[in-house]
Amino acid sequence: MFPEEIAMEAPVLNSHNKSEYEPAHSAEHLLNATMVKMFGCPRSRNAHVEKKKSKCDYILDAEPTPEQVAEIEAKVNEVISQNLDVTIGFLTREQAASVVDLSKLPEDASETLRIVRIGEYDTCACIGAHVKNTSEIGTFKIISHSFENGVWRLRWKTIK
C-alpha cells in the first residue's frame, strides 16, 4: 500500500473541473501503464476521456505493429480481468516524487497530492474519478490509431 508517511489530515487539493466516466478513466490509467511497460515511453502526452470514446497520444519512435496493437488491447483486458482494487492515498510532493512520475504535474499543484493505485499495476498522481475495482471497467476496445511525427494517437472505448 502507501508509505506510513501519508498525510492523514484533511489535505488541501487542487479543484477538479471535469467530469469523467469512471470506467474509462481507470482504463486510461491501465493503458498508460501498459504503454510504459511495453514501449518505455512516457504516459500519454494528452488524453481525452469520455464514455462514448476516448483518445490518448504517445510519443514513440515508430508506429506499433498490428501485433503490438493487439497485445496492448489484450494486456489491458487481462489486467481488468484481475479484479484489482483501486485505492487512493495522499502524499506530499516530496514523498510522491519517489513513487510516481511528477513531470506532468502543473506548477500550481497542491503540496499534498492524491495518489491513485490500481493493484500493483499502476500508481499515478491523479485528481479524477475512478472505479473501486477493475471489475467495474468492462472490456477495453481499441477503435483506431494513427501515427504522425512521432506521435501515436490511440482511440479506444470501454464496453460494459
Language-model region placement:
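Active-/binding-site microenvironments in catalytic and ligand-binding cores
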Residues: M1-K160
